[in-house]
Structures are given as C-alpha cells and as structure tokens.
C-alpha cells in the first residue's frame, strides 16, 4: 500500500515568494512527487520546510490524498503491489485529469 506525504521544496519558489505543495507517493521503497495546485507562503510552513502549519492547507491536501487512495482502491484493489510508485502516480494523474477516465 502506498504512503503519502505533503512536501514543499525550497527550490520550487515562484517569483511571488510562494512554494508549490507536492504529494510524495512512496510505494515499494520508491518515491515519486505529484505536484498540486496548492501554493504556500513561508508563514504557512516551518523554517525547515518539513511541515505545513496552515490547517486549511493541510485539510485541502488531505482531501487530495483521500481521493488518491479511493481511486487506487476502487480501480486497482488488491493488485497495488504489482505496480511501481511511478505507475500508481501516472494512474492517479490520468484518472484525475480525465475525471474518471481510466
């Protein structure tokens, strides 16, 4: 079963000073990062960039993670172990961009 973690990278800073939040998907000891449409300012994260402090942002990201889990469980079920982290991320991306298209 994959695990998920919201991640912010220092080097992903926009010109307006905000940072894009990505979701790290780890499966079978391999990780991939899926970018989100969520951006945070320095005030909304800890100084070490490890934790998002803004609870509203955390709720939004948690909703995305729950959606990702539901997509995988509903469509792939117990076959998750057959896929790589990259394949799972690609599947989620395909499914979310086509609104249920897989």
Protein language model regions, located:
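Short, Gly/Pro- and small/polar-rich lid/capping loops
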Residues: 1-11
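N-terminal helical hairpins
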Residues: 16, 29-102
């Amino acid at each position: 079963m994959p695990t998920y973690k919201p991640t912010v990278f220092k080097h992903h800073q926009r010109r307006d000073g905000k940072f894009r939040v990505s979701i790290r998907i780890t499966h079978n000891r391999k990780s991939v990062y899926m970018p989100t449409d969520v951006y945070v300012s320095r005030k909304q994260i800890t100084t070490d960039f490890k934790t998002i402090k803004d609870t509203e942002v955390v709720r939004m990201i948690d909703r995305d993670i729950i959606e990702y889990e539901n997509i995988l469980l509903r469509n792939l079920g117990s076959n998750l172990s057959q896929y790589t982290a990259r394949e799972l991320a690609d599947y989620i991306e395909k499914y979310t961009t086509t609104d249920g298209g897989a």
